[in-house]
């Protein structure tokens, strides 16, 4: 899903995208990035066995802060509801960079479920200047939180977009049952 957003920006001359990887699910991410032709410019290499959420978030903020200082982005697109997405939004906000939240407005109404994703969604939403909501329902959730209508755009679902893109490829499988 992130790959579609990055690839579309890469194909638009108005944007100079700077993909950053946290290192989470490295092998799976490499396969997907290869499929969509994406090479992260930075890899934070955050993931290590036995670390807790606070360590992940603090290391993410520190690593992203260095990248923000080096790259001087105009905008940070924080996608999803992971703790590293929240860390990216906070690091950018602390540096005065505009934050765009992709997949904004998803809500369960229970700050502890799912944990920590629901809290991450709300925290990102507090610092985002533009909220890209996947559905009209997500937009309504944001409106109930007093986000201005002019700051919300319903964009559709990035997972479905990526699935439709991949389904359109002329892929040959070795196993005839998959054709």
Question: How should each PLM-predicted stretch be described?
Answer:
Residues 117-130:
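Membrane-proximal helix-turn-helix segments that form the acceptor-binding/catalytic region
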Residues 20-27, 127-179:
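A nucleotide-sugar donor-handling region in carbohydrate enzymes
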Residues 77-95:
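An aromatic- and histidine-rich active-site surface loop
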């Amino acid at each position: 899903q992130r790959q579609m957003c990055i690839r579309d920006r890469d194909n638009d001359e108005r944007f100079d995208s700077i993909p950053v990887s946290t290192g989470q699910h490295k092998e799976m991410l490499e396969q997907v990035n290869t499929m969509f032709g994406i090479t992260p410019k930075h890899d934070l290499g955050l993931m290590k066995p036995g670390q807790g959420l606070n360590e992940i978030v603090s290391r993410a903020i520190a690593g992203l802060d260095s990248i923000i200082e080096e790259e001087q982005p105009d905008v940070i697109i924080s996608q999803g509801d992971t703790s590293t997405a929240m860390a990216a939004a906070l690091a950018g906000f602390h540096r005065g960079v505009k934050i765009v939240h992709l997949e904004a407005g998803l809500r369960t109404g229970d700050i502890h479920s799912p944990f920590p994703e629901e809290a991450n969604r709300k925290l990102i939403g507090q610092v985002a200047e533009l909220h890209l909501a996947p559905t009209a329902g997500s937009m309504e959730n944001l409106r109930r939180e007093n986000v201005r209508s002019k700051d919300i755009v319903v964009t559709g679902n990035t997972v479905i977009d990526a699935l439709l893109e991949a389904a359109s490829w002329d892929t040959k499988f070795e196993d005839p049952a998959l054709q």
